[in-house]
């Protein structure tokens, strides 16, 4: 029986292994050759299930940076998995995320098995947008938007909403509306956020902001009394 160890060089990203018989003390350790990064990723990492791949990010910062690249699938193309349908069930304020294979022929009578992935636990959400590129946008009761990965359970809070020239203590009625989408030109996930204030029937102020995920970029499109429309949609089609 042999025990295998692996490590990663932060300089060249090469993987090597070593084994030593546990029943033979003092025997020299045998080393395997270095594995090139492209061979390692294309033949090992890319074949792992998504949950196992998520655990690999804990090996080193270098592994994590490679796996989390926005263009990872373009640099190391792999066979796309079969499309799946995402189900979200809300119970007592908790969201449960399920998925099942998408049927090839929806007209046929066939039973599908849904797999439970994650739930939001004690975090209470009341609104959900998406999914877009494997992520959804959830809304908390305190109007904070959260980008959530239903497979890995990772989440990222959006910046707190604010309106220029308005003292927060003077807010009488504030609302916000989010829409989640993908920019195919810049290849970035973006959130369109509209915030506005009203007191009774009087319109006070509103802003249109675009948030880009993965950066600190927050671009204000319009503000103050810019009234374009009462509804909008941003997403893939």
From Swiss-Prot:
Coiled coil: none annotated. InterPro entries: F-box-assoc_interact_dom, F-box-like_dom_sf, F-box_dom. Residues 41-72 form the F-box domain. Pfam families: F-box. NCBIfam families: F_box_assoc_1 (TIGR01640). This is Probable F-box protein At1g53815. It comes from Arabidopsis thaliana (Mouse-ear cress).
């Amino acid at each position: 029986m042999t025990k295998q160890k692996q490590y990663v060089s932060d300089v060249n990203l090469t993987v090597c292994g070593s084994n030593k018989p546990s029943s033979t003390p003092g025997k020299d350790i045998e080393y395997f050759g270095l594995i090139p990064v492209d061979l390692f990723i294309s033949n090992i990492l890319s074949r792992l299930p998504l949950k196992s791949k998520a655990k690999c990010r804990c090996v080193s910062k270098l592994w994590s940076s490679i796996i989390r690249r926005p263009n990872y699938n373009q640099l190391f193309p792999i066979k796309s998995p079969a499309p799946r349908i995402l189900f979200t069930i809300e119970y007592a304020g908790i969201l449960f995320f399920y998925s099942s294979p998408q049927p090839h022929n929806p007209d046929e009578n066939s039973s599908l098995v849904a797999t439970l992935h994650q739930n939001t636990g004690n975090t209470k959400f009341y609104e959900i947008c998406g999914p877009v590129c494997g992520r959804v946008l959830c809304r908390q009761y305190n109007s904070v938007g959260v980008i959530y990965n239903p497979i890995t359970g990772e989440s990222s809070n959006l910046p707190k909403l604010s309106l220029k020239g308005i003292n927060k203590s003077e807010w009488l009625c504030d609302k916000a509306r989010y829409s989640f989408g993908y920019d195919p030109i810049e290849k970035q996930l973006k959130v369109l956020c509209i915030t506005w204030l009203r007191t009774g029937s009087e319109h006070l102020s509103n802003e249109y902001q675009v948030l880009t995920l993965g950066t600190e970029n927050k671009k204000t499109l319009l503000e103050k009394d810019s009234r374009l429309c009462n509804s909008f949609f941003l997403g893939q089609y």
